[in-house]
């Protein structure tokens, strides 16, 4: 299970990836922070501010469209069923996410490779697929063509909550395994060399 992942210098307890719509090839990265985390307000403010920058002119202004919402720990419709039992049943969790919608250019969909927990519970290296849990939090290779519309030049390919700065994906249950941590500089993609296969 990916634990203790640093995003915007905030320790995030769990991260998982879900393909929301296999037709449009839309992926969602979900991160959960307990409501009593000292930086919850900071995360919400940063997400809201960057959403307004990334999606300037967008009609949607709800908390969900800004990339955050509050989720109960037993809400397996929004929380991975393998993650839900690990959460504190007495807390709500701030769920924030980045969505890569490759409907405009599905052939350029971001592919993420990581040491991940397979369906049988084993840890293996491969492409992170639908509803997989990122096992050790390391990203080995990302196709940058669709990693946010700044890189692709297509507004149809974007991240909701592009502010998420995955500074260091470290201190996981499988620390030291797999590729070195990936870095996304100031919320945008780092040089492609940093994501060499």
Task: Give names to the regions the model predicted.
Residues 98-128:
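A beta-strand/beta-hairpin structural motif
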Residues 35, 146-148, 168:
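Beta-strand elements of well-folded, non-transmembrane domains
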């Amino acid at each position: 299970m990916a634990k203790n992942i640093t995003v915007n210098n905030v320790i995030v307890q769990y991260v998982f990836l879900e393909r929301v719509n296999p037709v449009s090839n839309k992926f969602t990265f979900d991160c959960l922070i307990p409501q009593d985390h000292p930086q919850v307000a900071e995360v919400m403010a940063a997400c809201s501010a960057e959403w307004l920058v990334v999606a300037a002119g967008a009609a949607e202004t709800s908390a969900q469209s800004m990339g955050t919402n509050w989720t109960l720990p037993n809400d397996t419709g929004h929380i991975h069923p393998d993650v839900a039992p690990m959460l504190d049943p007495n807390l709500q969790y701030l769920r924030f996410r980045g969505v890569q919608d490759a409907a405009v250019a599905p052939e350029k969909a971001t592919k993420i490779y990581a040491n991940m927990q397979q369906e049988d519970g084993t840890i293996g290296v491969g492409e992170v697929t639908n509803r997989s849990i990122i096992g050790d939090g390391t990203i080995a290779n990302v196709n940058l063509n669709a990693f946010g519309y700044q890189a692709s030049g297509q507004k149809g390919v974007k991240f909701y909550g592009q502010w998420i700065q995955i500074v260091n994906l470290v201190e996981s249950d499988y620390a030291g395994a797999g590729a070195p941590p990936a870095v996304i500089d100031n919320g945008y993609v780092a040089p492609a060399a940093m994501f060499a296969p």
